[in-house]
């Protein structure tokens, strides 16, 4: 009887689906899918992956421990996951035209941390972009590890153009002699001059690290200059504009740096890689090598320009007066609004974005004077210029309504939400 019970139990273990095993978690997943279906996603760091990428992540590869690298694992039974990881690496090398790639970092932050572990010592000076100017926490912000372990100096933007102040970068580099200069960020709407950054880095003998997390898809599609010829090392996430699973990656053309990076990722910073996620990365890189991906990225940029233009026509102040990329920053001060209030109002109307600091912002990070908007997810869904024109008008309606009636903007929000849901019903996800 006991053996029979165990056999039945095992049969259930391998065959019972999530809804039957854990209704609470399944309900949360179903609710999130419903939210994604019914809301317009404008968070610039989010995107929508293909069904194939999701399927790759939900496979038996989640069972496999594979510490080390292909051909040099600390566990047996890795011959098949070795092949998957090698596919991911080969596709990434082809996509970005570089010599060496590490696809094991669990996130962009882990990738950045691994580079610093490989090339720096605690107490070394780093020069990165300040958060309020458009940088990222991992580029030397005080609350982050990079701001605690290193002497972090921050550059910003020109007060007139609100674009990267390369003169300031050079002046700070000459003054502080950083061991590493970091280019890239989380809210930069204009093209980055990587050649100029390398010129400055060479002048002071610094490593140049480029964090291309937000623009990796644009670079892969040839719609933004590549940092590969200029940077000593490049990091990225694999989601955002690359439209892959949530994860990180490190690239370089230099063999000596590659060896240090590999040692820093494992065993320096991580243990076993997430092989199911690496499988998803491989699938996404394969998708990005297809001609359709170039069309997709062109549409992302075109949609961003359309959205920025509509918002400007509605009286919004767009930082740098437009965008070259997938994202834009909206300065809400002329409308008398705060970023957190605008984010909440737009979400009530079915449009998700994030509050965001703007250059020289005096508000706290949980308040802010702006919002950040991006077009990757909407474009993945199938929205084109016409849809983004309408979305821009809806955003204008909500912001104007909030400015006129900050205590109760419910009528405007309710009306916009109804229209948003009608639009979303025409572009369903995962049907």
Curated annotation (Swiss-Prot):
Residues with PTM N6-(pyridoxal phosphate)lysine: 240
Places the protein is found: Cytoplasm
A Pfam family hit: SHMT
Cited Gene3D superfamilies: Aspartate Aminotransferase, domain 1 (3.90.1150.10), Type I PLP-dependent aspartate aminotransferase-like (Major domain) (3.40.640.10)
Gene Ontology terms, MF aspect: glycine hydroxymethyltransferase activity; pyridoxal phosphate binding
Key words of the record: Amino-acid biosynthesis, Cytoplasm, One-carbon metabolism, Pyridoxal phosphate, Transferase
Pathway: One-carbon metabolism; tetrahydrofolate interconversion; Amino-acid biosynthesis; glycine biosynthesis; glycine from L-serine: step 1/1
Site residues (Plays an important role in substrate specificity), renumbered to this chain: 239
Enzyme Commission identifier(s): 2.1.2.1
Function: Catalyzes the reversible interconversion of serine and glycine with tetrahydrofolate (THF) serving as the one-carbon carrier. This reaction serves as the major source of one-carbon groups required for the biosynthesis of purines, thymidylate, methionine, and other important biomolecules. Also exhibits THF-independent aldolase activity toward beta-hydroxyamino acids, producing glycine and aldehydes, via a retro-aldol mechanism.
Family assignment from sequence similarity: Belongs to the SHMT family.
Assembly description: Homodimer.
Name of this protein: Serine hydroxymethyltransferase 2
């Amino acid at each position: 009887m006991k053996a029979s019970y165990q056999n039945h139990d095992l049969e259930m273990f391998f065959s019972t689906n999530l809804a039957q095993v854990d209704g609470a978690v399944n309900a949360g997943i179903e609710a999130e899918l419903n939210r994604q279906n019914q809301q317009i996603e404008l968070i610039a760091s989010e995107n929508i992956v293909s069904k194939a990428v999701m399927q790759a992540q939900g496979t038996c590869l989640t069972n496999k421990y594979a510490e080390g690298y292909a051909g040099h694992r600390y566990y047996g039974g890795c011959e098949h996951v070795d092949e998957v990881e090698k596919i991911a690496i080969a596709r990434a090398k082809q996509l970005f035209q570089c010599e060496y790639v590490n696809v094991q970092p669990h996130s962009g932050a882990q990738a950045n941390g691994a580079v610093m572990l490989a090339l720096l010592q605690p107490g070394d000076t780093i020069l990165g972009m300040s958060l309020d100017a458009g940088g990222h926490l991992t580029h030397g912000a005080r609350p982050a590890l990079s701001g605690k372990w290193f002497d972090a100096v921050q550059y910003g933007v020109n007060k007139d153009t609100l674009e990267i102040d390369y003169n300031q970068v050079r002046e700070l580099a000459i003054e502080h002699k950083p061991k590493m200069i970091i280019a890239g960020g989380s809210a930069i709407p204009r093209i980055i001059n990587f050649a100029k950054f390398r010129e400055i880095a060479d002048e002071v003998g610094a490593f140049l690290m480029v964090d291309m997390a937000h623009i990796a898809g644009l670079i892969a599609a040839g719609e933004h200059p590549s940092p590969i010829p200029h940077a000593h090392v490049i990091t990225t996430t694999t989601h955002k504009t690359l439209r892959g699973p949530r994860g990180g990656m490190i690239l370089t053309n230099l063999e000596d740096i590659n060896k240090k990076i590999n040692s820093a990722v494992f065993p320096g910073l991580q243990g076993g890689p997430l092989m199911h996620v690496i499988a998803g990365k491989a699938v996404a890189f394969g998708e990005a090598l297809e001609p359709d991906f170039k069309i997709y990225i062109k549409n992302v940029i075109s949609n961003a320009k359309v959205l920025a233009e509509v918002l400007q026509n509605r009286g919004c102040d767009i930082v740098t007066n437009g965008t070259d990329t997938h994202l834009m920053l909206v300065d809400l001060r002329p409308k008398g609004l705060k970023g957190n209030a605008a984010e909440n109002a737009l979400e009530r109307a079915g449009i998700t974005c994030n509050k965001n600091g703007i250059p020289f912002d005096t508000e706290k990070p949980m308040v802010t004077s702006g919002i950040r908007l991006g077009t990757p997810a909407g474009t993945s869904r199938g929205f084109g210029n016409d849809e983004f024109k309408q979305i821009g008008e809806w955003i204008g309606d909500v912001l104007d309504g909030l400015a006129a009636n900050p205590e109760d903007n419910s009528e405007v929000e309710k009306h916009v939400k109804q229209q948003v849901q009608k639009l979303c019903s025409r572009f369903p996800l995962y049907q």
